Amino acid sequence: MRTGVVVMLTSWLVAEAICNVVAAEPMRFGGPTMGTAYHVRIAAAPSADVKRLQVNVEALLAEIDRQMSTYRPDSELSRFNRAPAGEWFAVSGATAEVVAAAQAISKKTGGALDVTVGPLVRLWHFGPKQLGIKDADTPFKPPTDDALAAAKESVGYRNLDVRRDQPALRKQIDKLEVDLSSIAPGYAVDCMAALLKESGLENFMVEIGGEVRAAGQRDDGQPWRVAIERPIAERREMYAAIELVDAAISTAGDYRRFFAHDGRRYSHIIDPTTGRPVEHSLASVTVVADTCLEADGWDTPLLVLGPERGFECAEQHSVAALFISRGEEGEAVRPTTAWRERL
């Protein structure tokens, strides 16, 4: 689950402005997908058949949606969520790959990433049809301890098994459900990038809901550049622009979706281990990685862990991450060793 992620549109427009292209007009297209939008920009490809590319990209995204959507009752994931415990449920290799990637990060972060956290998200009114807002007058009361305890009984990544050989999922408790919205968009971005490369394209930037991957260079021969947003709720403001060279980037933040109640702020970033919204000073985490699956998978759990534990975890696993925290004298910015080496 992610905030209005900040690296493109909202940030696509920022990236477009940063590019300031002076060469030939680039090819671009986009459309709705996964409850958000996708965008493709292709540079230095005068012979590319844009219409055919768009058809192929949208067919690819439709297939991923058919596999991993929780909005569609007929998707693989929705059918698995209705299945009984204790039995292997056959899924596509793609779904098994994404779940396995999420489970690996869950283990490395001590459960800070948990794709079974949906009941807790809904309990705090941050589900797909429950928009967290920043209106202090919004009638909202935090759930009771009993309600939290009941919801936590149906949550836990350790209650989920995945196998890649003869791909399948298995739940250990009947009420367990899986939601891949915290990582599936990154996987879809990687798939779009692979499709473009298979089509002979070398210079492009692709994005879904703020998850970005770039290859090659812009029309003017310069590296692609993307914006990292300053983590403030009142307005959209660029903190920095970075060059993205054959890499992916993703940002998680706690400053767009939240409730206020009795003078207390409740973010949509839920700590699966406590069942409650995080309350530390860390406002956003940006991750750069070779794949968007990796970048998308790491940003939220590092944010959940907070400014100290998250940073230590990122250092331990050589994650290129930028931590921006709130401080009494403004922002405190802390890059990991891998971030400094990479950028």
Model-derived segments and spans:
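Mature catalytic core of soluble alpha/beta enzymes
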Residues: 2-343
